[in-house]
Design a protein with these regions (language model features):
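ABC ATP-binding cassette signature C-motif
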Residues: 1-151
Length: 151
């Protein structure tokens, strides 16, 4: 199987001490892994390091050349609260591609159980479970090779 991501000697230091030290692993196409740990042990931080949102204190993350990665956020960003579900799903795409991909956003939202009427509602009206499904659709719209899910 082809390698999608390689983490080498990752170290993340916080004000409370190290979260992880010399963490190394490889993710290949078809791999499915889960992280289990107590609150504050670094699970979300690791995902942020893997997707480039946060730089490690030391170490490196390498992504395969044509690999597209997406991370499902843990919480709905406040900036999306005034957007419709459709707008929120299309937002991760380049502006010039959004109209052409509207059909895909509608299909993803329908597969997640949203009706056309709900797709036009503001995201602030959603329950917690509905927000989680919306966040998954936001990641899937990019058709990633590697999907990182945070809770």
């Amino acid at each position: 199987m082809s390698t999608l991501l390689t983490a080498h000697a990752l170290h993340v230091e916080t004000a409370f001490g190290p979260l992880f030290n010399t963490l190394s692993f490889t993710l290949k196409k078809g791999d499915r892994i889960g992280l289990i740990g107590h609150n504050g042990c670094g699970k979300s931080t690791l995902l942020q390091v893997l997707d480039g949102t946060l730089a490690p204190t030391s170490g490196s993350v390498s992504l395969a050349g044509q690999c597209l990665m997406a991370r499902v956020e843990q919480h709905l960003p406040e900036a999306l609260h005034t957007q419709s579900l459709l707008q929120a799903v299309l937002a991760p795409l380049p502006a010039d591609a959004r109209e052409a991909q509207r059909w895909l956003a509608e299909r993803l939202l329908a597969q997640m159980g949203f009706t056309p009427a709900v797709m036009e509602q503001q995201t602030a009206t959603l329950s917690g479970g509905q927000q989680t499904r919306l966040l998954l659709a936001r990641a899937l719209i990019r058709q990633p090779d590697l999907l990182l899910l945070d809770e």
